[in-house]
Amino acid sequence: VLYQNDDYGKDYLKGFEDGLGDKAKTMIISKITYEVTDPTVDSQIVSLKASGADTFFNITTPKFAAQVIKKAHEIGWKPTQYLNSVSNATGSVLVPAGVDASTGIYSAFYIKDPTDPQFQKGKEWDDFVAFMKKYHPTGAMNDNFNVYGYTVGQTMVEVLKKAGDNLTRENVMKQAAN
């Protein structure tokens, strides 16, 4: 496991270990941290390879995730890789890391991937494109985080529509939960 040495990384690791339960002690053979100020995580990847790990959980942020994927590929380390949802954006992580290097990595995300042609059609896509052109014309259309921001904003729009003129905290929370 590679994780950021702060509350974000430690909390993500704790959740992972909690999920593994008693098996965590035997399944995780190496836990290595990095600092957000580190220029690269190359040395950490070399150390993880040297540990003999055949499975790797990448709990990093996008910049470091791309470095990890690329470095593991460069040094021939081919563990089964799991990438956290924070860093699985195709356009800003996987492509910069290299398509060959990114092939076979497991991850999950809860929004449509803007680089996937099957999602680049229909009213939702057209609305997203129109929004980006109007409000964020320099934004990358292939960036999951732009899609995420848009979907969060649209969720709030729906909540406020349902709340109508009754914009009390109680009613807004009621509509959000409904």
Stretch-by-stretch model annotation:
Residues 1-75, 118, 123:
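Extracellular/periplasmic Venus flytrap/periplasmic-binding protein
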Residues 2, 30, 83-84, 170-177:
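Beta-strand segments within the central parallel beta-sheet cores of soluble alpha/beta enzyme folds
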Residues 13-21, 49, 95, 129, ...:
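Class I S-adenosyl-L-methionine
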Residues 21-22, 50, 74-77, 134, ...:
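Secondary-structure boundary motif
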Residues 69, 73, 129, 157, ...:
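Generic hydrophobic alpha-helical scaffold/packing signal
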Residues 72-149:
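Extracellular/periplasmic periplasmic-binding protein-like sensory domains
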Residues 134-146, 157-178:
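Segments of small-molecule ligand-sensing domains
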